[in-house]
Amino acid sequence: MCLPRPASTDAVGVRTALLESRLCTVFPLRFDDLEAMQGAYKSASIDDFMDMIQPHFHALDASAAPLSLTTKAGPAAARMAAAPPWLRRLTECIARYRTVTVHDTLSHPIAMLLVVSSSGPDPLNAFAQLYEASKHAADTDILRCYLVLHDTATAGSDVSRSLALLDEVKRTYGLQCALLPINSGAGAGTVAADLLAAEWAAPDLRRAPHASGPTWPGALLSTEDIARLRTFVRELVTKSLVPYLERNEQRLNEQVVSLRRGLANRLLGAGRKLFTARPPSPGYDAERDEYPPASVTAQTRRLADLAFHVRDYRLAAQMYDAVRRDAVTDHATTYAAAAGEMLLLTRAAMAPAASDLDALLCAVCEEYAAIPGGRLRLLRAAVLYSNVQRQTPRYESVAHALLRGALSADEVMRGVLLEGAARAYLGLPRPHARKSAGLLLQAAAQYELCAQKTLARACLGALAAYYDTCAWPALHDHVLFHLARLAHASGEISEALTFLVRLVHPAPLAETAQHMDELCEVAKYADTLRCELPTPMWIAAACQIKKASEWPRTAQKGA
């Protein structure tokens, strides 16, 4: 298939379990190959994630709004507080990289699209094989849609055979079937291929990047093919996926309410003591740390995910909270943390100004930190929560979340999060310049360790301008010295000398010696050495020429 992996459909109407209508301005989708989904059923560590995203950060530059720690609150501060490109890139990578686990059922696929070409030798048998393969890769009640592809480049424009195949597929598998003609373009380099290039340019962290040239996806598509693709995606959402989600949410809502009411009645009948300190709920397997799919907690989590998909945030928050309380009682830390993460995001989407959201974030991060391999999930929860709060915007919560994520990050990722927190502090009604400066110092040091010289110099340049106006000479000298070293490492000798010359002033002996040694080292490589010291070495008005006979006698004896 030539569907873009991250796709979306605009203006989709959904209906909640209480029959309330909602309009989704954007209904996002993600298409993954079956092999990629099967390979994702393993816990990924933060080291694996860093190895995957490292190539995407080689081309980072300082193209964001320049930092100024002295800017007052207003539009300029809001522009600086906006997420820089490298933080947006990190957020996109984290959002796309969601491993499939039993504890986080939101990562499970909600539908399966089985695609077979009508030009194959036995299309019906191919559908049967795909159906059997999909039974082991998804939930039992998943939506399955069947798509017959008519490849115009190989089968011609006559679709009679494909239509006959479509009728046979409908009789066998039901009405969730469609026919899609593709590849009617003239060849590679068409306008249609260029239209899809931007959608395929987004990095897919589960697969190797596609090569350019005639093998580029969509090379034979025409503009009519692209229009048919987009129409198919919209009909898939509005006529198949959304009705499936709505039906299952209503059905599960009735089941879960009945099950939980019956469980509560049994517990209350046994007495208050049993209700307040009950044993693990039936169905929880403590040895495998797993809730069976038929258990009350698993069904509640499934209902919460369905409600989240149809934007029924109130019901989703109630169900995530119930799952979290069950998991905490059963000492299922991984389930509790996963439900807490979704409860955090759901409540932030409902009421971003709630006072207890930051406390909930801290609790979720502590639970993830206690789980083996939970650092990546901690990072994802913090970054996604900060992204939700940035839309409000609530910059103090954004900074708090990014700092929590930086505690579990390494290398360039930590620098990105620290700089994002520093920028967020500048967006407050009363910008916290000192906090921002301290975080920028840490971010610059982290960038320097990771050889991200451009980003480090951008942070240090803002700090140098800020400390010029403050009475902190030691910090100012520290920033200038590191700017000089970065300029020297980049081969900009004259700029390095400019920074080092500003360090020639009265200072402690150890620091002065270090600065002078660096100045002498850099001066060796200067083509022309012309620099003006901040303090002149010779003050002509205060100099006198005296004969030796005019010296004091004590000076003559010493000589």
Where in the sequence are the language-model features?
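Extended alpha-helical assembly domains of large eukaryotic scaffold proteins
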Residues: 261, 265, 269, 273-558
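Eukaryotic intrinsically disordered, low-complexity segments enriched for acidic and Ser/Thr/Pro residues
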Residues: 1-282, 433, 438-440, 453, ...
